[in-house]
Amino acid sequence: MKYTCLILLWSLFATMALPADNLIQSISIVPCPESITPGTGYFTFSGKTDFTVENEEQAEVARCFSALFTQAAGFTPCVKVGEKKGKISFLTDDALKSEAYHLEITPRQIIVKASDTKGFFYALQTIRQLLPASIEGTAVVETADWSVPAMTIKDEPRFGYRGLMVDVARFFIPKENLLRIIDCMGMLKINTLHLHLVDDNGWRIEIKRYPLLTEIGSRRVDRPGKSFPERRNPRQGEPTVEKGFYTQEDIREIVAYATRHQVEVIPEIEMPAHSNAALASYPLLACPVVDKFIGVLPGLGGNHADVIFCAGNDSVFTFLQGVIDEVVELFPSRYIHLGGDEARKTHWKECPLCQERMRQEGLEDEEALQGYFMARMSKYVQSKGKEAMGWDELTNTRIPDGAIIYGWRGYGQAAVKAAEQGHRFVMTPARIMYLIRYQGPQWFEPLTYFGNNTLKDVYRYEPIQKEWSPEVRSLLMGVQASMWTEFCNKPEDVEYQLFPRLAALAEVAWTQPWHKNWRSFLVAMDKFNEHLSAKGIVFACSMYNIQHTVTPVNGKLQVKLECERPDVEIRYTMDGKEPTDRSLLYKSPLMVTGTQTIKCTTYRAGRQMGKTLTLPLVWNKATAKPVLGNTQAGKILVNGIRGSLRQSDFEWHSWESSDSVAFTIDLQKKESLRSVSVGCITNYGMAAHKPADIEVWVSNDNRDYRKVSGKQFTDGEIFREGTFKEDVVLDLNKEIGRYVRIIAKGAGECPATHVRPGQEARIYFDEVMIE
């Protein structure tokens, strides 16, 4: 069936060449091309379609594309080298930049021009997205119309580095699933796969010289039912289970497949930290002062993550050089990533070998010792004809000569610091490009940690900042999304976190900012999601869900409902019934008094698109009353909404244990007070715990206060394991007062037996309820 919604648009624009951002809904390509000139009619693929190409490299690109038709259409367009007059012709144009392409589609033929195989490949990926989504299937679709609209496209990338980092160490991604991700990367013109192969939680690559790395390092203890931060460290002798690794033959297959899809695979071998899997396999490579059992960590590890490679032991460098020797033979990439992040120097400070190394090398502190470590390994990588890369902690001391820095902390500012010293850099800021973060309203999302990086957050990211000098701008290689996998338990979990945000990253990396358009992107992304669905790829629909904000305003509650999608309606009810497409249409914030339950969801063309959000607004004497001296707390603690089990869901107010926790609620008149309830959350793995003690003070005039109730808790009551909510209820015995002051004291540092020993616990309150 022809795309009827396109036909009118093609006829309207048939004689006009317009920038891509003006052709809203006329095509469906992610990332958005540089320019498009619509034509008239359609080119139809059939068993008579043939490719004529100039050489074998082009032929390989054409065959990769033709294979899609073999499975989905039952015919295979033939590929001919050196012949003329094919339906689809490849022509080399040396005037085009690398990866750029010109694509001319008419009803009779398709002409593809590029200067390299990458450009030819990307031109065909553009055609692939224009085809029906059933092109991705494995069964022949007899009724499909394999037509694409006539047009001329001129396209080239904004950045040369368009990357995705996938962490296969914390959760091992089977080879077959990784290949599916690579295929999707090719469709999106993402050209770099940064493969995080090793960490505290697993060693995932076979090194023949050191077989224990996979015999021991790929295994770990199971902690069923526990999220990553909650998992306790392994005990010596505790049984382990195989979590997986790639053989060297697997790696060769992955690299070859990626090469066919124009994806460069960069291996990362972490050092000196994130090395428990390696040190569990070869414990003599740790500092001799380490007196604890070294095992592959199932979770964060607490102070066991302090165990890192010994910088004073030459055997460590011999070992790592041996690993690098095999890695360079497996990966043809120009680059090897050496990690370098989050190295705690606890044992280095106590280690006689490390201290002796510092004296020998004239190093002033342990940070400089890491600089020595990374510089030494960087030079070895360079001796193998490769370039070294590392995380932005390399800027904490002298950066290794020639090292490429990945900016990840915060908004990646440290990488700019490296650029000011002449180093190339890649931006992958955690606050925007870490796909482990929630991609939509958290009440609907699988548990992870930290805050939100929504589809729109990723899409609107602009890596080049106005204040950057021309020199800094010239050193930016590109951008990368980073997929950390500690909360993933199956390959589908990884896919869910990746898609569709990876499509947004693709447009950031490929498309010039002036061609980007949020509404146009959503239309194209919807079509791309159809391709994902046909491939059996799991993707999130979080952008259809509703984010709520409930704020006290003049004694009422203002309920604001928002959706990232501008093309949907929000329908809601206030009578407890499920919303339909005929329910009340949300147009502006709702003002609520008294207990209410609001239910709402999104609709488009009569079809429900998002999940139903239920907001039970619970009213009590504190609801919508002023909270004195703490504006932010006043927006949360008396807004009638209880928090979820995700303490970052914007319904929890938090304090460090060392903070002074004190706030006052003005009831605006004297009241008889029976009780105060304070909602708390325990998230053991994130060191979120209720306070050590809590007190209630009451006043009639906001000057003279009297203590009317209080509770204290033992360490056993505070530092309970699990993730759960509870209300701390304090009896006020019908005390009379207008002002109610809550004072709480934190529990301080988590005890030595905690999964986060020594870390300061945080207090989280969601609601104060006064009866």
Locations of the language-model features?
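Flexible, acidic glycine-rich loops studded with aromatic residues
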Residues: 388-393, 398-403, 410-558
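Contiguous, structured surface segment used for ligand recognition
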Residues: 20-159, 493, 508-523, 527-531, ...
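Aromatic, loop-rich ligand-recognition surfaces of beta-strand-rich domains
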Residues: 646-709, 724-771
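Active-site neighborhood of glycoside hydrolase catalytic domains
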Residues: 283, 299-300, 304-402, 409-417
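Bacterial Sec-dependent N-terminal signal peptides
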Residues: 1-25
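Short, compositionally stereotyped local motifs that mark structural "simplifiers"
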Residues: 19-20, 40, 52-53, 512, ...
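Surface-exposed loop/turn motifs at beta-strand-loop junctions within extracellular Ig-like
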Residues: 116, 602-606, 746-748
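Feature activates predominantly on carbohydrate-active enzymes
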Residues: 96-335, 376, 380, 480-484
